[in-house]
Amino acid sequence: MAKKIQAIVKLQVSAGMANPSPPVGPALGQQGVNIMEFCKAFNAKTEPLEKGLPIPVVITVYADRSFTFETKTVPAAVLLLKAAGVKSGSPKPNTNKIGKVTKTQVREIAETKQADMTGTSIDANIQSILGTARSMGLEVEE
């Protein structure tokens, strides 16, 4: 018999830096989960990744207060900013361009994100990443 699911908690936690402070502590504490157990497991799983990158995580909490979690890939916006070498997006993306990314970089990001994206093909995912880049004020070079 499958365990009864009590809650599904979605968070963004920095890779290798999970600790009981907000947002992790309050979100899991409300569900009665052992917070330190999650932090240790999450930090161990994200150890190979670059420290500090925001990692979306989906935590399934069961009625017996046990849990499982699944990490997703880094958000596309973060990968685009990193590729362009800038800190944040443009407040006016239509008029102020803040940086440039190449089609090759966009393709690499789309391939990295392939598992988490809803597009059926790599080309559809590339178009999605291009839209994200445009909305952030990034120019895409050939």
Swiss-Prot record:
Keywords: Methylation, Ribonucleoprotein, Ribosomal protein, RNA-binding, rRNA-binding. One or more lysine residues are methylated. One of its GO terms (biological process) is translation. SUPFAM superfamilies: Ribosomal L11/L12e N-terminal domain (SSF54747), Ribosomal protein L11, C-terminal domain (SSF46906). Pfam families: Ribosomal_L11 (PF00298), Ribosomal_L11_N (PF03946). GO terms for molecular function: large ribosomal subunit rRNA binding; structural constituent of ribosome. The keyword rRNA-binding applies. Transmembrane segments: none annotated. One of its GO terms (cellular component) is cytosolic large ribosomal subunit. InterPro entries: Ribosomal_uL11 (IPR000911), Ribosomal_uL11_bac-typ (IPR006519), Ribosomal_uL11_C (IPR020783), Ribosomal_uL11_C_sf (IPR036769), Ribosomal_uL11_N (IPR020784), Ribosomal_uL11_N_sf (IPR036796). PANTHER family: 60S RIBOSOMAL PROTEIN L12, LARGE RIBOSOMAL SUBUNIT PROTEIN UL11M. Forms part of the ribosomal stalk which helps the ribosome interact with GTP-bound translation factors. This is Large ribosomal subunit protein uL11. It comes from Hamiltonella defensa subsp. Acyrthosiphon pisum (strain 5AT). The gene is rplK.
